[in-house]
Amino acid sequence: MTDKRKDENSGKLLYCSFCGKSQHEVRKLIAGPSVYVCDECVDLCNDIIREELKDNTLSPKESSEELPTPRNIREHLDDYVIGQEHAKKVLAVAVYNHYKRLRNGDTTKDGVELGKSNILLIGPTGSGKTLLAETLARFLDVPFTMADATTLTEAGYVGEDVENIIQKLLQKCDYDPAKAERGIVYIDEIDKISRKSENPSITRDVSGEGVQQALLKLIEGTIASVPPQGGRKHPQQEFLQVDTSKILFICGGAFAGLDKVIEQRVATGTGIGFGADVRSKDNEATIGDLFKQIEPEDLVKFGLIPEFIGRLPVTTTLTELDEEALVQILSQPKNALTKQYGALFDLEGAELEFREDALKAIAKKAMDRKTGARGLRSILEAVLLETMYELPSKEGVSKVVIDESVINGESEPLLIFENTETKAISAE
């Protein structure tokens, strides 16, 4: 390979074979077999290749003329998630802005740099945090992976390295870094890595503050080096480079006890003795009401380090689901549990009917167990176990009816046969 200085010594004037500029009009002229290319044409070719690669790695949703609007995203979430209206609106706007930034680059035509906005979801168990993240990824048709913060440790200690999160995301898209960079990562149980006290620890906390420190760069944006196909790291191995600044991170947790921290901050007229603030039980704020008043300082007191909180600028809270919401969850969403079990029974040629009092009884059981929507499936499995065991062996069953007494264990499901004969199922 040669450059323009060598050819100047021979006295021959050289030109770029692509743009026709002479060696005096460009900074560098690279020689090949009977052809020359200037540095400007090389830069132009690189830009063209980058744009082509960008277009080829966009998901179907991104490559369409327009991104789904926040309203479109919210409406899709409504089809699968009951309640949590404020959280859905916050998520819709944050996700829309994130993918708009990816499509148009980090810098606007005016030179304004667009920052990255990761999301923190705070809400009790079974309130829909994971479902919201999964539904978003499915709607946008982007790679999605989940990680459990409780299994993470600092590099060099027993446990999962934080870079394993990116490795899981790569597995979901056949180890294509460009596709992974447009994915969504949901980190659950993020509250479990809070440090033991509000003040920085002088001892090693490898599963608490140490993990927060390790996650900082990953969430903010760094070039993560991941071994291909899950191989162990060694010096001779080529790493896959993934730019995490393009990945949307959603962190979620129940944050048990955070309501007490908020209540302590917002309480007025606190004191002791005769000056104490006496509240009746009726005036006590609910956990959901307190979560709505959350401030970054509350999360610091809970045990998250300020730098970590700063990487999660979009914070939204989910409220505890009441009995009415659980009844709706059982029957209204597109993939409602009653519809799922109905489809299973339909494969056996029988219709499954849940009466209204049965849905209320299921919701009441879930409320008593304090498991939220997460506990609904286990209740239904227990109730329908005997029926699902016997039904494939029975002939002529056209309908199975579940009422409140079945949920409470007082009677067996009602079987309606094709000849209209009705009887309760019995274990034979």
Swiss-Prot record:
Chaperone in keyword set: yes
Looking up InterPro entries in the UniProt record yields: AAA+_ATPase, ATP-dep_Clp_protease_ClpX, ATPase_AAA_core, Clp_ATPase_C, Clp_protease_ATP-bd_su_ClpX, ClpX_bact, P-loop_NTPase, Znf_CppX_C4
User: Which amino acid positions bind Zn(2+), per UniProt?
Assistant: 16, 19, 38, 41
Q: Which domain of life is it from?
A: Bacteria
Keywords, in A-Z order: ATP-binding, Chaperone, Metal-binding, Nucleotide-binding, Zinc
> Can you cite a GO biological process for this protein?
proteolysis involved in protein catabolic process
- ClpX-type ZB domain: which residues? 4-57
* Cellular component, GO annotation: HslUV protease complex
PROSITE patterns, sorted:
CLPX_ZB
Pfam families cross-referenced by the UniProt entry: AAA_2 (PF07724), ClpB_D2-small (PF10431), zf-C4_ClpX (PF06689)
Binding residue positions for ATP: 124-131
Molecular function GO labels: ATP binding; ATP hydrolysis activity; ATP-dependent protein folding chaperone; protein dimerization activity; unfolded protein binding; zinc ion binding
> What family does the entry list?
Belongs to the ClpX chaperone family.
Summary of the function given for this chain in its UniProt record: ATP-dependent specificity component of the Clp protease. It directs the protease to specific substrates. Can perform chaperone functions in the absence of ClpP.
Q: How does it assemble?
A: Component of the ClpX-ClpP complex. Forms a hexameric ring that, in the presence of ATP, binds to fourteen ClpP subunits assembled into a disk-like structure with a central cavity, resembling the structure of eukaryotic proteasomes.
Name of this protein = ATP-dependent Clp protease ATP-binding subunit ClpX
Q: Which gene encodes it?
A: clpX
